[in-house]
Amino acid sequence: MFTQFDVLETIDMVEREHLDIRTITMGLSLFSCVRSTAEETAKNVYDLVCRRAEKIVKTASELSGEYGIPIVNKRVSVTPVSLISAAFPEKAPLIGKALDEAAATLGSDFLGGYSALVHKSTAAYERTFIKTIPEVLASTQRLCSSVNVGSTRSGINMEAVKLMGETFKAAAKLTAEKD
């Protein structure tokens, strides 16, 4: 049971100290979406994300109203796209755009997962995928990307670090006009 002090302290934190919940996240596996073509996979990805996360914004609003604490961002996070696009990495941007469209349909602030896990080594399909990141980030609004290039156990994949330097430079060039 909450005491009167607890309630007043919470109100004070929300009003004077601007307490909020920065982000709520729903994680989804996309492995069931993989098909023989990028186009079919992208369609399945869009459908699955829209179906499974359809209530994320409504639920966040209800929770915020119930507890009186603002929830700033609603985010969906998915399986790293490099894993589900391994058979057609040059067409991975189709999946990225489908994810961005799904985020817009849901009203989600961000959708994370246009990502690769190359901390141990970098396969040819992963290099090809990583080279698509600048194009995808330049042509989407809500999609987030990440590349894991190291870990305590595996060390740092310096080949991947070099590739990411080139990728950052290309992304900066393509998005120079954006804020």
Label each PLM-derived region with a short phrase.
Residues 2-131, 147-166:
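Metallocofactor- and cofactor-centric catalytic cores in central/energy metabolism, strongly enriched
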Residues 134-137:
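Acidic, His- and aromatic-enriched active-site or binding-groove loops in soluble protein domains
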Residues 143:
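Conserved ASCE/P-loop NTPase catalytic core
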Residues 159-179:
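Extended, Lys/Arg-enriched charged tracts that mediate electrostatic binding to polyanionic substrates
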